[in-house]
Amino acid sequence: MDSRPLAVIDVDGVVADVRHRLHLIEDRPKRWEEFFARAADDPLADGVDLVRELAADHDVVWLTGRPERNRALTERWLAEHVLPDRPLLMRPDRDFRPARLTKREQLRRLRDDRAVGLVVDDDPDVVATLTEDGFPVRLADWLPHSSILRAAQERHGRT
């Protein structure tokens, strides 16, 4: 096992400010492809600062509910904001399970190989599930968690 623990960080709502595009998934029909295509988000200073601080003594792993087909766009965004761009774990394109389940599954696999020092996520349901599973978790509370984003994560399995 490597000596440095992992810092596992969500993207949307932690380092990327998605508020400007939430209207695309608020009403029906939900415009998911446009929502993801417009992911030229402003960075969230609190999240970016935390990631840079954690990178001093942790290996950063990104764990996002964004679908795999948005990998290049997400990696480009991370690079533009001078954040580590790999490893980046993403939701399989056709996996619409709640974020709390997909993230728990991915984290259990990571935990088999490395110590997980901290997980940072903005979704209270994800935080509760991971805490119950014994992961050290910090709720990213620098933005109020949106009910639109919560529905996307829980009911639609999209972010």
Predicted feature residues:
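Short, low-complexity, polar/charged sequence segments that are solvent-exposed and flexible
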Residues: 27-28, 79-83, 107, 138-139, ...
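Short low-complexity, flexible loop/linker segments enriched in glycine and/or proline
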Residues: 77, 102-103, 152-156
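Alpha-helical substrate-recognition element adjacent to the catalytic core
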Residues: 2-97
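Acidic, Mg2+-coordinating phosphoryl-transfer loop and its flanking beta/alpha structural elements
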Residues: 107, 113-154
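A short, conserved beta-to-alpha structural element at the edge of catalytic cores
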Residues: 35-41, 144-159
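A short acidic, often aromatic-flanked loop/helix-cap motif at beta-alpha or helix-coil junctions
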Residues: 93-99, 143-148
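Short loop-to-alpha-helix "cap/lid" segments that border enzyme active sites
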Residues: 98-111
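Glycine-rich phosphate-binding loop signature in dinucleotide/nucleotide-binding domains
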Residues: 2, 57, 110-116
